[in-house]
């Protein structure tokens, strides 16, 4: 109860502060020529067309009775990752952070939960579902070097999922399968699953030394360095040995690797069932599909992935395993940054062979502060101009699936008041353009807090400063989600019904009955 009161107080404090007024002067005339009145009118018209619906509801009230319709929740999901759960250094910061996530009244009604295999199962057979002492708020509040900890930005899943369930927040799991060796594949996989005799035979035949892992290797940069060496080693092996030769040399590893991937999905499915509403079943695999000449060969022994050796046709298998172990109610996402032809051909190939793809995930990261500064003067990346955003999602819509804009970064050029306003305006215009896309179903901001991203990501791309003070972009986003895009209307009853048009979501209808008492009805605009 005490924790709940702290979170409610934190949310109330941020709501009381929330006010956003655009300062157009921080952007050049050239910028406003790009985001001109005509472009804005087109966005407004598409938002009205695609994000709203007409609702008609029966009520027990005489004709002419005034009825207030107040939107409570969105059908569209506005999300962010929740990787810094309890890690921000003080109870007050953590409470503010947690208060951002919830079904009603919060900024984010959806949260992306980390299931990166490398940190989720740092040691074989020991998945980090439950919290240990090193995951506690007390640990992080006294930790002098949080970014150097192996579990920084990787909280155990149970406490995060339990919290989000208590808040009625939608939960998105990221990811189940991803070939990336730096962030996903456990260091121990090769050494644990491949017998020494097979390792020696492979190294002798190829002349390539495959890096070894042991538990004494520090997490963080040393571990990531080892992963890159492992990836380079496999590229050399591919160049020297045929697929058949490799398969003959390491058959035990190939079999065990498949079993290990399947076991991971089975364990997660058994643990969470329907608690998690959607999954990035496979992440960033289109490059491999292109590498294999855009044709999935289902009888190959393994995939000679650009990431390193992967299970044969791993993207296809990931969807089959997900279908086997996860509930039918969960949405299955194919997520990628690569929106080339290969992505759409891969989606077509997967579904043609029986994979269930419910949603396609697309990413957009504006990491470079200089690019944000250039955008403000009317230059910068063309893909963030309104007409190019529209063109991109006409292309993504070719997959004929709902779209989840799954990872969004828009950095500030700097954290001065002007820099924060530039970030807020870029974010506001892009969010409006994305929200107007017909097939868009949700948008997920990536790093909520400054200086809390992965190595190489900008330190000023958050909606909050490192000490959880709201930046201008927070107020701009809250203004969109909780004001501009929430419907409040007063209508009159007619023939035992009320009708109105509003953003899709849940509503509370209130009116005074004949006895003067307030009557309430909860409805959904679909």
Question: What are the functions of these language-model segments?
Answer:
Residues 19-88, 110, 123-130, 151, ...:
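Beta-strand-rich domain onsets/edges
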Residues 24-26, 31-33, 190-223, 233, ...:
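Aromatic-rich peripheral "rim/lid" segments of glycoside hydrolase catalytic domains that contact
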Residues 57, 111, 164, 268, ...:
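Conserved, mostly hydrophobic/aromatic
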Residues 79, 277-284, 309-343, 404-409, ...:
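Aromatic-lined carbohydrate-recognition surfaces of secreted/lumenal glycan-active proteins
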Residues 88-95, 290-294, 318, 339-354:
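Distinct, well-ordered alpha-helical segments
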Residues 90-106, 499-508:
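Short Pro-Gly-centered beta-turn/loop motif in secreted/extracellular proteins
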Residues 104-108, 113-242, 248, 260, ...:
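Aromatic-lined substrate-binding rim segments of carbohydrate-active enzymes
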Residues 333-363, 422, 453:
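Substrate-binding cleft/loops of secretory-pathway carbohydrate-active enzymes
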